[in-house]
Each structure stands twice: as C-alpha cells, then as structure tokens.
Amino acid sequence: MRVSAAKAADRLLSVEGVQAAFALCRIDDTVHISARSQGTINVQLILEKLGGGGHFDSAGAQVKNSSTSTALTTLRSAIDEYLAENL
C-alpha cells in the first residue's frame, strides 16, 4: 500500500502545472504520506514538520495514531507554513 502512495505521488507530477504532489495512505492506525516535487518545492522541509524526512524532491512521513483527515489537516498547515516562508 505504501508503494502505491509513492507511485500515486509520482504520477500526480505528470499533471500539467503540478509542482509538488502528496499522497496519503492509512494502514491500521498510521497515515503514510509520500511526497514528490518537480524541484521547485522542498518536500523534505514540509514533511520534516510531520516527523518525516527524505530529499528535496522526494520525501515521506508516517503519522501514527491519526485519522486521514487529521493528518491531511496537519499536512495542509505544514504546506501553508512552507509557502509563507519560502515563496
């Protein structure tokens, strides 16, 4: 399932105009987040705010004991914070 999230994030980057993609997948009580970037947005910095890590254009995080909607809200906040600080 986590591999599917990574593939989904990769696939979303092929959509015209998409600079970064985030895919979420819940397994048991953990939400797995896979992120990819075209190189203009540092997804590593965004997912570090959720306890994850990786590389500038490819990163991941696991949010334990969370619903998908709660993890998504937290992710949106991290993205908004990143954009306010960096763009």
Each model region followed by its residue ranges:
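Gly/His-enriched, cation/cofactor- and phosphate-binding structural elements
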Residues: M1-L87
